[in-house]
Each structure stands twice: as C-alpha cells, then as structure tokens.
C-alpha cells in the first residue's frame, strides 16, 4: 500500500483548554489519549511509514506537540529521511531557545493556532491571557526564519459568521500585519460540542467525506488501555477517540491496521451510506 500523508500526535495533553476543543470541555479529553508518544513507538511508526513511501508527516493532533520532550528530535528524525515535516502549535512555548532549535531542525512548515482576533476574544476562546505573549513569540519566529527552509503560518477561526468581514479585518490588523505571517482563516470547529445549530449536520442529507479511502492515517499519541499510537478515523473524532480507534501502531503494522477488519467495516459503512452504524 502507498501512504501519502501521516498525521501523528506527539502529545495528547495540552497547556491550553480552548472552549471549542474537548481539552477544555467539562468532560475533557479521554484520559487514555492524553499520553506522550514514546520515542521507541515514534521511531517504529515513522520507519513503517517510510516503507510505504510516506511523503509528508504532520506532528499534530488534539494536544500540544512542543510538550513532548522529543519534539525537536522527532522533527530531525523525519527530516533526516527526506520526508516533509509540518507541525501545529499554540505558540505559547516559543521562547528564543526553542526557536533556535526549530530553525536547526529544518522543519518545513510551522503552523500556529490562534482563535480570537484581539486580547479579549483570544482569552475568551483559548482561556489563556496570552495573546500578546504568543504574538511576540510568533513575530520573533517569523523574523528569525526568514531566508531559511522553514515557512511559518497561522490558522484562525471565525467566531461569528455574521461578523466575518469585521473579524478578518481585525485579524489582519492585530495579527497578520503585526507579525508578518501568512494566514488561513476558517469557520469555527465544534469539537467540544458546546456551540449550537450552525454546524449541525442534517441526517437527511449525509454523504461520506472519502477519508477512509485515502492514502493517509490519523495517529494519536495515546491509545486504549496501555496502548499508544492509536489509529483513528479522522481528526474530527477528537474527544471520541476510543470509539473511533481502528488499531494501534505500537504492536501492529500500518498495513495490518489499514487492511484490518475495523478499517474495512468503516469503508463499507461509507460506501453503503450506513452512517448510523459508525460509532
């Protein structure tokens, strides 16, 4: 089998508790999935992915990757295999020392997640009074990576679709122009389930996304029980990882999971449009 992309979580916990994320919900993220991926399991998974011709590995998931002590060694391990490497962070830990290490790692793309267009909305959504701190961290990262292999990007979410134009204007003024960063702006995600109506999916008009048939895998740092490296259906199952687990790469190969019974059941349910049969 050919594997094009591997999304791999290094750390299942987080130093933030954002309102739109299960990390910040009353229930919180499932305990089994808040682990740090071990170095041995990380190497096993990357080596296996390399055998399947993986083109890109993104170190992100539902936690903060910089909290894994092997964050920089993980990037270097991937880059030494000539595989594209990307990560997504909240940017809080980007001090001068980490920035130097990031540049030295030669990571291809470093993405920053920022929800909120000013100090007040950032604190409301990300539940941390760190808008200015992160903004300065990222401005420094952008400046120091100029002329290097590393591209720095930010990802933002619209808080109120009715005020989209205003929010884009504020993001441009308070964030994009200030830091000099390239940015993506998306509609709000609702992983935590705390928002009403606007993003509900109609049960009368459903279709498969096609992800179960794509040459890509979504891997969590944690797993059921003592396992690590759980393969889940997609990134949108965050908060329900246990029900979405298709196998574990700490004691299975990528091919065993991808061609396994649970993965095939998921594909069959999509093909036959039996969406209520999907946990």
Q: Which residues does each PLM region occupy?
A:
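Accessory C-terminal segments flanking Radical SAM cores
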Residues: 1-9, 175, 179-279
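Conserved alpha-helical substructure of the radical SAM core
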Residues: 1-109, 120, 124-128, 132, ...
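Anion (oxyanion) recognition and catalysis
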Residues: 79, 146, 176-177
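Conserved strand-turn element in the central/C-terminal portion of the radical SAM core barrel
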Residues: 85, 138-166
């Amino acid at each position: 089998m050919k594997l094009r992309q591997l999304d791999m979580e290094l750390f299942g916990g987080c130093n933030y508790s954002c309102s739109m994320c299960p990390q910040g919900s009353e229930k919180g993220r499932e305990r089994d999935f808040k682990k740090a991926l071990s170095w041995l399991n990380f190497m096993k998974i990357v080596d296996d992915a390399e055998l399947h011709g993986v083109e890109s590995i993104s170190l992100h998931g539902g936690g903060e990757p910089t909290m894994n002590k092997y964050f920089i060694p993980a990037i270097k391990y991937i880059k030494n295999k000539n595989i594209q490497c990307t990560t997504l962070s909240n940017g809080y830990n980007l001090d001068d020392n980490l920035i130097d290490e990031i540049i030295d790692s030669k990571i291809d793309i470093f993405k920053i997640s920022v929800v909120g267009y000013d100090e007040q909305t950032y604190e409301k959504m990300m539940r941390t009074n760190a808008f200015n701190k992160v903004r300065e961290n990222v401005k420094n990262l952008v400046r120091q990576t100029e002329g290097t292999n590393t591209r720095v990007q930010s990802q933002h979410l619209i808080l109120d679709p009715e005020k989209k134009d205003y929010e884009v204007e504020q993001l441009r003024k308070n964030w994009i122009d200030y830091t000099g960063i390239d940015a993506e702006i998306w509609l709000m995600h609702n992983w935590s389930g705390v928002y009403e109506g606007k993003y509900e999916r109609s049960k009368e008009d459903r279709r498969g996304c096609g992800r179960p048939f794509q040459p890509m895998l979504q891997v969590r740092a944690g797993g059921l029980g003592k396992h690590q490296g759980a393969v889940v259906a997609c990134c949108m199952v965050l908060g329900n990882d246990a029900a979405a687990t298709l196998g574990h790469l700490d004691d299975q190969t990528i091919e065993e999971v991808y061609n396994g019974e649970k993965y095939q059941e998921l594909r069959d349910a999509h093909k036959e449009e039996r969406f209520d049969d999907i946990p």
